[in-house]
């Protein structure tokens, strides 16, 4: 009898939680982007916004907490209320590399990810009139002219920079990476002929298709928007990389709520209209849910840390 009473009490305690999670969301969800408006983190959140409303009946309210390349926002994530109504965008390699460079107010393990939903693949980009018609052309030039092949990119320790370090090692070349503050300035340097090429993203190819060409994209398979552009893997280089984006919640968020949010983002990702919108912008969909998040981060940490040490980004 005593056991039955205890079981009844336990069941009663579980039911309200389960019921609340089943009804979630019952009000707007606050989606914090740890960067300013207009960047890809903002653009992809805006893409999610309308689908969230249509599927779940509540608004996804986007706000911004820029600073420190995302660090200001991530350092405050766990101070937010963990009720499922506060979520924050996360980026790789940022959340892995930044804490290794200096004190930024958070460690990678402080981030509780519930879904990695896409990445913008790295790509080597050249102007339409570039003498480099293929990736091999660029590699041959770099081998004959060590450190004289200049390539712009978005900052040190970014996805672009780590891709440059990794590819140089794979190809047996030494190029010179010229870091700019943001993709926009790196593209401007390319278009202004200040560099020979750019370590950019597939989104650059989508946005500036009338002015640039991509020699290769860092994907497992060719991007559907760019069927004529080969992957690095096709050309003999095992390089799949880019700027990965996902969503995290405060650590205090209950496991049931994390799982529910994870399923919601998965549902948006599966929508053909959402996929088409993302791919048209040059992005690639990814489906790493809450259950697979830690394993994914561990795998990427090893890749990024090796490249960061190789490139002198961290000691």
Language-model features: where?
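Bacterial N-terminal signal peptides
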Residues: 8-16
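Hinge/capping helix and adjacent helix->loop/strand transition within the periplasmic-binding protein
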Residues: 52, 76-86, 99-181, 185, ...
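C-terminal lobe and pocket-closing loops
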Residues: 119, 203-270, 299-302
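Short coil/turn segments
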Residues: 38, 92-93, 127-132, 153-158, ...
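Bacterial N-terminal signal peptides that target proteins for export
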Residues: 1-8
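An extracytoplasmic/periplasmic, membrane-proximal ligand-sensing/linker region
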Residues: 26-28, 169-175, 255-315
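N-terminal (or domain-start) structured segment
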Residues: 23-110, 148, 156, 169-199, ...
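Sec/Tat signal peptide C-region and signal peptidase I cleavage site
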Residues: 17-22
